[in-house]
């Protein structure tokens, strides 16, 4: 197997995203790329970043910043948004992408005064 770099396709939410400059192994007999675990992880994270950029979703850093701005733990924000803590953790780590609806809710929390208090009152 020989290491190569090139454009690979990765599906995010049913959409095939073309990720440039990806590292993979090429088998001389086969046509399918072979990915090492670290390369596959980087490919997925890069595809998620491309998806977020394409649809103008908050980045993982922006999501973390919103949570930290209010002094919340991942568990506290997850409860307010009615999510599992692991889901929020994956968004912040760039391993999964939030839905458009959750993106809007996070933006409202960030941009609308009193949003946190409203969620605290009505999330239970």
Briefly describe each language-model feature range.
Residues 35-101:
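Extended interfacial segments that mediate partner engagement and assembly in macromolecular machines
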Residues 90-124:
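Short, Lys/Arg-rich amphipathic alpha-helical interaction segments
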Residues 1-57, 111-124:
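N-terminal flexible/basic segments that precede or flank functional cores
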